[in-house]
Amino acid sequence: MNLRKDKVVQSTDGDALSSKYSAVQKGYLQDEFIDLFVAGSKQAAAQQGPGSARKVVAQFQPKLPLINRGTFVRHHAIDVLVDRFLAAKKPGQRVQIISLGAGSDTRPFSLWSSKPENRDEILYHEIDFAVSVERKRDIIMQDSTLRELVGAQEYDKTTGMHTQRYHLHGIDLRSIGPGFVLPGSDPSLATLIISECCLCYLEPDQAKQVIFWITSEFTNSTIVMYEPLSGQDQFGQVMIENLASRGISIPSMTKFPSLESQIERFKAAGYTEVLATSMDVIHDEWLSPEEQQRIHGLEFLDEREELLLLLKHYCVVWASNLTK
């Protein structure tokens, strides 16, 4: 176990949070809960000293239009696929969502807030490193709205949080193997697994083991995965080198460099329905003309070709064994 590498991976949650915060501030996205997590991130940094506090303040400065647009497309794609999963359930049916490497994601709170019936119908699990989970638990417990949404009754000082509708797990995904039982999970429920730039940080054999656990434990399941592609081209190689300069290694970019290799990856794992597309296609084809017009009006973007090249090197995969 490489503690330095773990800390680098944990720090990427701050990157994702600050990017989403910038997109929210510019009007690309709506998130009524993000300010709580930004404040929590700044508070945690302040406790580590002036250097960390200054770094976090700089991190939450507005992003370039290119980054804001890419962040919007990422969240739009995941939103569409989560909505697709939920739309397939029958009225009153209970389903389960398991988010790998959830970090500061606010999705469960938004789902429960937007539709009160979701509180009884969506069992939500979030998995991340213990240090990330403890910070998220503290943010939840310090806010009455979040406490009510998750159904928390009292402040439990143990790692994580467990209620009737929400489970926050401090688990290292590398420890998951055959026979592992996720506390509070219900394998009988239709289950959606979300991996937003999570499995990509694991070594291929470790990620394969997690996917095998999912397919064996949750036989009625769908995986929605978002991660980068190298494309086996110069741009992808530059991405890999830039990440390496920050101490970030993404093994999946080499092991699964293309859409075709990602599709084959999940077919080999036993999934019967596997679809994959790059984010440039989502940008051009998944947005309505009205939404395209709206986001074009938010900021001037003179790097359309650069944006599409960047988006081409990220993908979303839908792999399903859901019972019809």
UniProtKB/Swiss-Prot annotation:
Q: Does the keyword Kinase apply?
A: no
Q: Which reaction does it catalyse?
A: [phosphatase 2A protein]-C-terminal L-leucine + S-adenosyl-L-methionine = [phosphatase 2A protein]-C-terminal L-leucine methyl ester + S-adenosyl-L-homocysteine
What are the record keywords, sorted? Answer: Methyltransferase, S-adenosyl-L-methionine, Transferase
Q: Which parts of the sequence bind S-adenosyl-L-methionine?
A: R74, G101, D128, D172, L173, E196
Top-level enzyme category:
transferase
The record's listing under InterPro entries reads: LCMT1, Ppm1/Ppm2/Tcmp, SAM-dependent_MTases_sf
Pfam entry (one):
LCM
Q: Write down the EC number.
A: 2.1.1.233
Biological processes, Gene Ontology terms: methylation
Top-rank taxon of the source lineage equals: Eukaryota
Q: Name one GO molecular function term.
A: protein C-terminal leucine carboxyl O-methyltransferase activity
Q: PANTHER family in the record, alphabetically?
A: LEUCINE CARBOXYL METHYLTRANSFERASE (PTHR13600), LEUCINE CARBOXYL METHYLTRANSFERASE 1 (PTHR13600:SF21)
What the record says about family reads: Belongs to the methyltransferase superfamily. LCMT family.
Q: What function does this protein fulfil?
A: Methylates the carboxyl group of the C-terminal leucine residue of protein phosphatase 2A catalytic subunits to form alpha-leucine ester residues.
Indicate what this protein is called per its UniProt record: Leucine carboxyl methyltransferase 1
